[in-house]
């Protein structure tokens, strides 16, 4: 098998038994693809689909004036180049965006001509604001900060049928309802009331009888009845009544009279229930009509209007109940046939007929007016306005759109064949929905499950941005229509008509402040990836935390392989915010799909298909772990499968699909937990969430027990440097890698050099440190896609969030009570959990009413010592070690001038202007922060003189740019001439400097020739001469390009910065803080086993084993059984085996002997580790160690001395017997337990203790960020009580329960002190402070300010209250 550069250096032993069917897809695809479809950049007009920007323009344009004489049409758009690149945007605090230019055409028609002849066409490109661009890693830079747009899981447009689960009415009756949800436009609801009438609501307003809507659509009473009911025909005769017999309709009824066949034989006697058997007899007997008594006819309802045959007079309207009087009238008027509605209580309810009776309207106009009154109460309706409103609600393309998804879901739910159709509704749609609702009420059909993932779809960045853009365009449209009428006369151009501001504002609002545009979680690479793969049910058009019930939050059968059942926050958002599963993707409609492998006749095929939740129920899907033989045939006769969202056993022949991987169920974070299958779900949830909070440590350390997903996360997160093209490392240092590209991957004439610049010590969103370290050495060969440099929390191309610690499960003097963690001093000494945090401190100089603030080293009333770290501009030096209270940027602000006395005025006049009053408002280091200044940035407003420091920074940056560009050119030039030499040496020359005709060009000749002279050589070979020309052109072009780049950079640096109004200068100081681990810091494993460090013990006091090796961490064994996360114990055992194997390999390397002998022994031992197995536990992956050279084997072995990395993936991990085999190989006791000795006394502990290696994380809940103390500080304005919280430098709340405690103790004076001088007795606390300064500790409590507030509030209610003086 092919190994990547990093894999060859350190192979992870994989215990997986199932061969991989499908590689893990690119993890950020959902973000990148969605936005790519939105921009459709680089596509020609013909290639662009009707979606994204193009779709938004097409849907709003053309904009036609009110008179119809002028129109503005959309032609095309293009995106310009962004002004600043991503890094510059982050530094300057601006948005990374590209200008959008739209080509529009203004068409003016001739008013006079009848057939709208075109009078004038004006076409122009109009600037429409900036569109933020996505970076390569799926983020946006908005105002200098990286943000992520989270995808939203919302209810799909379409039609849904539901009932209230019996909650509305006291009887517990199920009230059914139907709701048509469009993508945009008014909602239409149909619902039953407890009396079984059907009502309609538009946009959740007041309800109206549903037949009003049908009348408004143009249906009359007869039509409505004909549409929703079957009819039964009765024949009226003088001597009685007959009816057409449709035998089936009588099923289940009680016979009110004897039913006999033509021969007079009794079929059903009176009072008996008619059964299926009776119906069969009736059908056989050939009866067509039945004689019925009068009682049977009473209460039946007429289906049509009944008119007197002679006079044409209306005797009875349709939907009238038959009574004795009415029947007599009908018979006497000579009517012989009456059609009645066929209804029964079982499956044909009279709902529409009942609704017609309560319908106050009788024709279309009345119905339209009724709807108008409901939508616009208080406005007088006219015929036109009522018609216009109703048309606009559901039938106008501008106001209503089901969208492609909505139409597909709508048609599928109503059982139609085609998936496409109009975006607006028509009469058939509304009638079909009503019919389906009635069917469900009649017991034919089921209501929908709204939590089914076939009814919820994902809206990603691109779609949300498009909607927002459309909103902006619609706002513009109103203004344009008004201006268009003027355009005819005034000769305006498109530019004068279109105002880009509303569009830009809509986009800015969406990216800047939408609920789904979130500040990127950048703690570590995993948290970045997870944030981009998050799916939220909250946000605009979604749910709210308060209203979401249990069902929405719960795990659903359709989540399988689409949404992770484990990873979701604890707390109020549980189940509303989810994570995509590893293999999930969205289809063109926005529904989540998951891949399955096809099974044909019980045999696996290589074909994989993606299936959405809508289609999944019909398939029979086997687990990935189903038993198969060598040829891929299912072995078991009965296979455990999922079918119709249930798990059952089914014969193997019926299986259609099979999971592609056992980890397709879980998300990326959950798939990083080894032995996940042995952990309780609640703890696994905490484990996945806590991995995202791990702080990158100083030295990343790969997990010895992993899952094999680490490399995918590291590569896809974008924090590493990945080779775009293969080649040889030309040069490498800490800040750049230069690759000479393989000749087969280059284009002719190109230099074939790739230069990668590394990110060094940059602050992340969470103040952690982003730093890249190179892995490659000069001269090494790499392939495209190899990782060349590690990022934060990455070790050799694998995600490394924490450290492998030697742990023991045992109690130790109560120091690990309640999940506390006891840590050895060695851990601190070796800097295992030391992390670097970078804080950005900003000082802003503004223009105030009293004059400008000034950044200067000349600060009033500050000693020399405090200024020692500042330069002459008043800004701290880089490299200065700063402590709390140190000045970073000296700044003075003008103070309000006091009114001068005449004497002062005179003195000023004599001695000249005294330095006007300024106060010190310098930026100082906050309490609790001490570190080193690593960078300073100065931004100056345009038109203001730059200070010396700004000029110095600018010069050094320019020098660096010039140096980089020159270096780049030198590398390119060298590579070009080396390629040319290959092409020229040995060629026959036709001439050249110092060359005879037909001479052969030698290496020596070229070595003595100056480079510019090479291009004068003429050669016979056409290819070589063409290469010479191309190379010369390419070099000249490259030089030009680099010069242009330099000039561009210079221009950007020298022009002033675009700062907020009123801001003159901004100085940003970056301070790096080194945080060692200390008591109070939170740590965790990957199995939800979290705790706080209680004490850091000297190494000599820690328990040690028989070899004298002390453990690093002592954990409480009681944390395991009740929490049921046994995965951590298995990890500990396998970790011990891994480290033991590493030790053995190290011993083999250390022994001095012949190299060949050492390599042979290592080869066989590594083969035993990687490819050995017992019984039938054969791992799917075997390592091809024979393909490794001796050198490579030695490199591999030396990288394994710290422990052989193992992978135990989710649901396909190491079995107990395999762990025991590894322990045996490592020469460790199979029980994994060790005899330990007390470090203090040297006595052995009573029982053996489980000791091994566990991967521990340090979480971003550091005690340094939480420690806080205050003596005096700021107070709240109204109550005069101290503020709360560390950020406000607040006090500790002394609440009512604390007051009760002091009352219970009878500590009256302490209580008085708490409620007065320590809180809000303004005079008392001032006196107290003064007394303490004087060394006098008496207190004189007065009236608390909050009591005065209470008095004032009572007075504001009009109640007089005053204090009596004793």
From Swiss-Prot:
It catalyses: RNA(n) + a ribonucleoside 5'-triphosphate = RNA(n+1) + diphosphate. It is an enzyme of class 2 (transferase). GO terms for molecular function: DNA binding; DNA-directed RNA polymerase activity; ribonucleoside binding. Pfam families: RNA_pol_Rpb2_1, RNA_pol_Rpb2_2, RNA_pol_Rpb2_3, RNA_pol_Rpb2_45, RNA_pol_Rpb2_6, RNA_pol_Rpb2_7. The keyword Secreted does not apply. One of its GO terms (biological process) is DNA-templated transcription. Keywords: DNA-directed RNA polymerase, Nucleotidyltransferase, Transcription, Transferase. GO terms for cellular component: DNA-directed RNA polymerase complex. InterPro entries: DNA-dir_RNA_pol_bsu_ext_1_sf, DNA-dir_RNA_pol_bsu_external_1, DNA-dir_RNA_pol_su2, DNA-dir_RNAP_su2_dom, DNA-dir_RNAP_su2_hyb_sf, RNA_pol_bsu_bac, RNA_pol_bsu_CS, RNA_pol_bsu_protrusion. CDD domains: RNA_pol_B_RPB2. Its EC number is 2.7.7.6. The keyword Transcription applies. Belongs to the RNA polymerase beta chain family. DNA-dependent RNA polymerase catalyzes the transcription of DNA into RNA using the four ribonucleoside triphosphates as substrates. The RNAP catalytic core consists of 2 alpha, 1 beta, 1 beta' and 1 omega subunit. When a sigma factor is associated with the core the holoenzyme is formed, which can initiate transcription. This is DNA-directed RNA polymerase subunit beta. The lineage of its organism: Bacteria, Pseudomonadati, Pseudomonadota, Gammaproteobacteria, Oceanospirillales.
């Amino acid at each position: 098998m092919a190994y990547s550069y990093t894999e060859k250096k350190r192979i992870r032993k994989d215990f997986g038994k199932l061969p991989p069917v499908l590689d893990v897809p690119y993890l950020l695809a959902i973000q990148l693809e969605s936005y790519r479809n939105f921009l459709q950049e680089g596509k020609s007009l013909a290639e662009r689909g009707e979606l994204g920007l193009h779709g938004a323009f097409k849907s709003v344009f053309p904009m036609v004036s009110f008179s119809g004489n002028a129109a503005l049409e959309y032609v095309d758009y293009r995106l310009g180049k962004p002004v600043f690149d991503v890094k510059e945007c982050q530094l300057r605090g601006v948005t990374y965006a590209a200008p959008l230019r739209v080509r529009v055409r203004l068409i003016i028609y001739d008013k006079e001509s009848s057939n709208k002849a075109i009078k004038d066409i004006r076409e122009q490109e109009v600037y429409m604001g900036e569109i933020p661009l996505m970076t390569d890693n799926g983020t946006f830079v908005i105002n200098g900060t990286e943000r992520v747009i989270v995808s939203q899981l919302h209810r799909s447009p379409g039609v849904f049928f539901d009932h209230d689960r019996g909650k509305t009415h006291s009887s517990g009756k199920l009230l059914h309802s139907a709701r048509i949800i469009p993508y945009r436009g008014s909602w239409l609801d149909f619902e039953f009331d407890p009396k079984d009438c059907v009502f309609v609501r538009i946009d959740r307003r007041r309800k109206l009888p549903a037949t009003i809507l049908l009348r408004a659509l143009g249906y009359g009473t007869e039509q409505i009845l004909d549409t929703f009911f079957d009819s039964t025909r009765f024949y009226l005769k003088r001597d009685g009544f007959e009816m057409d017999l449709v035998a089936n309709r009588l099923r289940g009824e009680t016979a009110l009279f004897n039913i006999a066949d033509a021969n007079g034989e009794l079929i059903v006697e009176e009072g008996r229930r008619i059964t299926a058997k009776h119906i069969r007899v009736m059908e056989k007997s050939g009866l067509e009509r039945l004689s019925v008594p009068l009682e049977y006819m009473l209460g039946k309802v007429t289906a049509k209007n009944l008119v007197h045959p002679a006079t044409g007079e209306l005797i009875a309207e349709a939907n009238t109940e038959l009574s004795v009087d009415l029947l007599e009238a009908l018979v006497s008027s000579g009517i012989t046939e009456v059609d009645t509605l066929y209804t029964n209580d079982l499956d044909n309810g009279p709902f529409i007929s009942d609704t017609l009776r309560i319908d106050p309207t009788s024709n279309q106009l009345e119905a339209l007016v009724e709807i108008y009154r409901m939508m616009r109460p208080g406005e007088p309706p006219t015929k036109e306005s009522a018609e216009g409103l109703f048309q606009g609600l559901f039938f106008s393309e501008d106001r209503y759109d089901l969208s492609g998804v909505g139409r597909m879901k709508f048609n599928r739910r109503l059982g139609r064949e085609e998936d496409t159709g109009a975006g607006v509704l028509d009469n058939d749609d509304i009638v079909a929905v009503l019919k389906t609702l009635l069917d469900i009420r009649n017991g034919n059909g089921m209501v929908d499950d709204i939590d089914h993932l076939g009814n919820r779809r994902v809206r990603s960045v691109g779609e949300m941005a498009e909607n927002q853009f459309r909103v902006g365009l619609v706002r513009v449209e109103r203004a344009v229509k008004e201006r268009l009428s003027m355009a005819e006369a005034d000769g305006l151009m498109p530019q004068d008509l279109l105002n880009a501001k509303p569009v830009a504002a809509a986009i800015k609002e969406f990216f800047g402040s939408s609920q789904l545009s979130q500040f990127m979680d950048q703690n570590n690479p995993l948290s970045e990836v997870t944030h981009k793969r998050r799916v939220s049910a909250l946000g605009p058009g979604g749910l709210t935390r308060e209203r979401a019930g249990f069902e929405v939050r719960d795990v659903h059968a359709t989540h399988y392989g689409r949404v992770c059942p484990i990873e979701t926050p604890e707390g109020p958002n549980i189940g509303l915010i989810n994570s995509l599963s590893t293999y999930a993707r969205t289809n063109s409609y926005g529904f989540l799909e998951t891949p399955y492998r096809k099974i044909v006749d019980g045999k696996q095929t290589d074909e994989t298909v993606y299936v959405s939740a809508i289609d999944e129920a019909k398939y029979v899907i086997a687990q990935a772990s189903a038993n198969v033989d060598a040829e891929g045939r299912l072995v078991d006769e009965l296979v455990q499968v999922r079918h119709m969202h249930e798990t059952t056993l089914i014969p193997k022949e019926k299986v259609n699909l099979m999971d592609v991987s056992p980890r397709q169920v879980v998300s990326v974070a959950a798939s990083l937990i080894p032995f996940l299958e042995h952990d309780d779900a609640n703890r696994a949830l905490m484990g996945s969430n806590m991995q995202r909070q791990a702080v990158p440590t100083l030295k990343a350390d790969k997990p010895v027990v992993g899952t094999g997903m680490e490399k995918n996360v590291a590569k896809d997160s974008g924090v590493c440097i990945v080779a775009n093209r293969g080649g040889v490392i030309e040069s490498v240092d800490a800040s750049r890698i230069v690759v000479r590209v393989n000749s087969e991957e280059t284009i002719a004439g190109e230099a074939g050099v790739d230069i990668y610049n590394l990110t060094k010590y940059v602050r992340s969103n969470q103040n952690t440190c982003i730093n890249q370290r190179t892995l490659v050495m000069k001269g090494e060969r790499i392939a495209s896609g190899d990782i060349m440099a590690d990022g934060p929390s990455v070790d050799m191309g694998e995600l490394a969030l924490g450290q492998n610690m030697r742990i023991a499960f045992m109690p130790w003097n109560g120091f690990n009570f309640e999940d506390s963690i006891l840590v050895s001093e060695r851990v601190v000494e070796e800097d295992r959990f030391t992390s670097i945090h970078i804080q950005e401190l900003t000082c802003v100089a503004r223009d105030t009413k009293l004059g400008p603030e000034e950044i200067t080293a000349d600060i009033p009333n500050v000693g020399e010592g405090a200024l020692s770290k500042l330069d002459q501009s008043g800004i701290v030096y880089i490299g200065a070690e700063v402590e709390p209270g140190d000045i970073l940027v000296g700044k003075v602000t003008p103070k309000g001038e006091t009114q001068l006395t005449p004497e002062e005025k005179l003195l000023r006049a004599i001695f000249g202007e005294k330095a006007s009053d300024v106060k010190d408002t310098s930026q100082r280091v906050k309490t609790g922060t001490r570190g080193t200044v690593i960078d300073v940035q100065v931004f100056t407003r345009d038109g203001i003189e730059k200070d010396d420091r700004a000029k110095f920074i600018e010069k050094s940056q320019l020098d660096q740019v010039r140096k980089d560009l020159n270096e780049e050119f030198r590398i390119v030039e060298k590579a070009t001439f080396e390629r040319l030499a290959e092409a020229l040496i040995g060629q026959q020359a036709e001439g050249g400097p110092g060359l005879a005709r037909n001479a052969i060009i030698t290496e020596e000749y070229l070595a003595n020739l100056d480079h510019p002279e090479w291009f004068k050589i003429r050669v016979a070979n056409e290819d070589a001469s063409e290469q010479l020309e191309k190379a010369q052109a390419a070099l000249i072009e490259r030089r030009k390009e680099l010069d242009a780049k330099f000039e561009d950079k210079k221009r950007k640096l020298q022009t002033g910065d675009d700062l907020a109004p009123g801001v003159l200068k901004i100085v940003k100081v970056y301070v790096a803080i080194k945080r060692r681990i200390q008591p109070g810091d939170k740590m965790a494993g990957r199995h939800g086993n979290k705790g706080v460090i209680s004490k850091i013990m000297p190494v000599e006091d820690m328990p040690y084993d028989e070899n004298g090796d002390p453990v690093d961490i002592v954990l409480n064994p009681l944390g395991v059984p009740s929490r049921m996360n046994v995965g951590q114990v298995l990890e500990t055992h396998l970790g011990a085996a891994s480290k033991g194997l590493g030790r053995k390999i190290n011993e083999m390397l250390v022994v001095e002997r012949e190299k060949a002998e050492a390599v042979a022994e290592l080869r066989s031992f590594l083969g035993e580790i990687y490819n050995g197995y017992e019984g039938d536990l054969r791992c799917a992956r075997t390592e091809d160690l024979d393909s490794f050279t001796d050198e490579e084997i030695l490199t591999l072995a030396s990288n394994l001395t710290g422990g052989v990395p193992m992978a135990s993936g989710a649901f396909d991990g190491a079995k107990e017997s395999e762990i025991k085999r590894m322990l045996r190989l490592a020469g460790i006791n199979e029980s994994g337990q060790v005899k330990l000795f007390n470090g203090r006394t040297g006595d052995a502990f009573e029982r053996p203790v489980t000791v091994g290696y566990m991967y521990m994380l340090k979480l971003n809940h550091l005690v340094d960020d939480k420690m806080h103390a205050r003596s005096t500080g700021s107070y709240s304005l109204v109550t005069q009580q101290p503020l709360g919280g560390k950020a406000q430098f607040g006090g500790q709340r002394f609440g009512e329960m604390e007051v009760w405690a002091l009352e219970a103790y009878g500590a009256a004076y302490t209580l008085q002190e708490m409620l007065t001088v320590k809180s809000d007795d303004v005079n008392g606390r001032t006196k107290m402070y003064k007394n303490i300064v004087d060394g006098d500790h008496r207190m004189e409590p007065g009236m608390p300010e909050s009591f005065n507030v209470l008095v004032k509030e009572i007075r504001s209610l009009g109640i007089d209250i005053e204090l009596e003086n004793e």
